[in-house]
Amino acid sequence: MEGELVFNTSMTGYQEALTDPSYAGQILMFTFPQIGNYGCNKENYESEKIQTKACIVKEWCRHPHQGEENFDEWLNREKIPGLEGIDTRELTIITRETGTLRAVISTDGKITPEEGVKRAKEMEWPSDSNLVAEVSTKKTYKKGKKGPNITLFDWGVKQSIVTNLAEKNKVTVVPWNYTIEEIKKTKPDLIFMSNGPGDPDHPEMKSVVENIQSLVKEYPTIGICLGHQILGLAMGGETYKLKYGHRGGNQPVKDVKTQTVYTT
């Protein structure tokens, strides 16, 4: 199994993280020392399946106090490789110092460490592909029965976002590459650009950015995660890949004017 190795510092929300389409193409490693403490339930999914290539933990909880199944049973049912017994915090420090790594996980015992390193070096970065097209909805669907009309670009949206918006709005979820004409037919009061995986500056996303450039002149727009980056590109900004991603809760945010750091 090959993938981009990333880490998450949250203490809870392991199911939400693993089913988040933003992690498509990646191997997710948790820094919290034990994962699966409260079991696994279908209600915690952010999409229809686990989106990561694999999962790495220091230890998984054998006897959770609740849940329909334990962490290992869940990964097996979803056919996702899991690796236990790794000092994930030490590996996270290495990742933080060297930058995001490409990784290979082997289960057959036939691949030597040297062969694994070679395969990792030859591996393409997941963001070289158009991951948005892979995780986006293939057809339009609607949620919510009252309130303003929100047209939501699904670039890998978490279902909790759709659910929360639908509580007080009428939400139309559309595929990643919906055209300007198709968007206008949905009669939006607001355009919402979702989270998602990959590179916002990917060549196949150029037309999307151009569409947003036109739409922001006519409609109120909101972007979150990847959507925020796409909106930035549409407004003339630039994006670049961080040395390592910031994934987890309580992210520090620095006010560059006052030099004050806030915890979100």
What annotation goes with each model-predicted range?
Residues M1-T163, E167-E181, K185-T186:
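RNA-binding accessory domains that recognize and position tRNA/RNA substrates
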Residues T88, T263-T264:
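Ser/Thr-centric signal marking residues that sit
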Residues L190, S194-T263:
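Cysteine-nucleophile active-site neighborhood
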